[in-house]
Amino acid sequence: MKTRFFLFSILMGIGLGITLQIAFSYYFLYIEQSQLFLLTTDYAWGLWREAGGFALWLSELVVQYFAYPHVGAWLMAGLITLSAIGSGFLLYRLSHSRVLAYWGWLPACALLCASLDFNYNYQGIMAYLLFLFFAIIYISVRDFYFRIGIGVLSLLALLGSSGTVYALFALFAWIYEISRKEGRRKWVAALMPLVALMLGYYLYLDCWTETLGGAFSPRMYYHPKLDPKGVIYYAWGAFLVLSVIGGILVRRENPDKGKRVWIGETISALLLIGAGAWGICTYGDWKSLRFMELDYYSRTGQWTKIEENCEGKLTNYLYMFLLARALSEEEKLATDLFRYNFRDEKALAIPWNKSENISTLLSDLYFTCGNTALAQRMAFEGNMGARGKNNARLIQRLIQTNLIFGEYIVAEKYIRLMEKSPVYHNWAKSQRVFLQDDKAVEQDPVLGVRRALLPPDSVEVMASGTELIPALSVPVLANPEKAKVAFEYLAAYYLLSRDMNSFIALLNSYKDEVSWLAELPVIYQEGVLVAFENRPEKWKEYALNPDIVNSYVDFRKQVLANRGNSGLPGLLRRTYGDTYWFYLMFSK
């Protein structure tokens, strides 16, 4: 191969890195948290002794660094570029065609498209790279029988280290031997597919795969409980088709030369760039990218960025859920609730489906609101369902919640676990200052306030139930003065659900007990006006601001004056769009 192919690959890799950084930077930050890599011999051996374990270990080793901004996109671009160069080298050795070498980017692009599916395991990319490594060694051996021996050993090595990619190696080796046109020897090479068949049957019988077909395909590298998309098969299929074309149909004894090569390379490069762009546009999980961005801001405490990204119309309850938490963390839920497009009470309480992702979100919510027991339970449940051995984000939460409860032995167990992670070692080490030190916990701005919200009941009682109202009532009942966030969540839930009786009951229970309700927030006063619209004598009891009362009177007058006017919502939005009255009348 000439320098042009390597130059094209480097430029393609740079372009890919820029594209991934611009479009998918938060995707890589999101997928990292679902697997906590531990740099220990026990952890490595636990993975290596399983079929495909070494490739899985390598993938987790790489993916852990996705936790750093900008790193994930460039690491992925590097892996895809490496796979393209390796594929191109093998195709060139098969065909002696410089043009066909460029098409090594086709299976590489297919790998990229597969990796943009959250449920695809990057073990598949590492397995493909290991296949290329063994395939290059295989074709470098000149002696036929020695090469066949190396091939059989490579099959066994790939099965143990990389999983089902051994089947791809067996077919490639057979195609390679057929392409050499060495008479009867090529039929001896059929030994490779036969050995692969026996290995696959063994995998199936030993329950490594659920189906016999899965023992010979990349199905192994997809979430075991979900049906894979067809794109996960494209890389293998493309490489085998190109191998047949290069090794059997267009094979040359000498490298191609001349002007036609330049033309072929140029056309191939343009087609491959187009194919890559089409693949990214088609298979990228574009619908989830905004959520992943908001989730990253939530995880890192960048609350104002969540607010900025949620201006205007919202249609996704997950966005609303994250926005509500951001407002709560900034103590703005009681002031800015109706400045944003919350559709109804479902925006505050997504149902728990026992999945890793939803458990993580609910753990964050309950931690914010001060129900530490439920935050811990959701973290534990989510971690049990993690794609990897552990979820880094949820292990952090388990450390925090056990410190709050004073369960220092359990907290230290999780700290020791996380200290074995190269990425999270420093954070875990910083938590040791709280071990066996109640004063340090109580003085910490994150842990201390949540310890103050612990009720006197047992952990089992606190952890029972996952409904929002009883869950948020726990910290409010335990310490009303410090449970402002939980109180505001409850009040917001009642207002959004139009449950005025519960809203008034909540206010009556605490308005004379806590200092921060000495003057009711504007939206609470608006709610009181709605609840006691026909009982103005009640208004004085809640010390309603006369300006708010006058605004409500004007709102009613304009509504009555424009009855039947289809443009009424637009007419009133500018003046009353952030009021509870506007929400009641025009939200659907």
Give the location of each predicted region:
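Cytosolic-side transmembrane helix boundary signature
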Residues: 221, 227-268
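Start-transfer (signal-anchor) and selected internal transmembrane alpha helices
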Residues: 1-17, 261-270
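Membrane-interfacial interhelical loops
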Residues: 27-65, 110-118, 201-233
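Transmembrane helices and adjacent periplasmic/lumenal helix-loop junctions
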Residues: 119-122, 140-182, 197-207
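Transmembrane-helix motifs of polytopic, lipid-linked glycan transferases
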Residues: 77-95, 109-110, 132-137
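Membrane-embedded helix bundles of polyisoprenyl
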Residues: 11-20, 101-117, 122-136, 150-169
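Internal/C-terminal transmembrane anchor helices
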Residues: 258-285
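Soluble catalytic regions of membrane-associated enzymes that act on cell-envelope
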Residues: 278-462, 475-500, 506
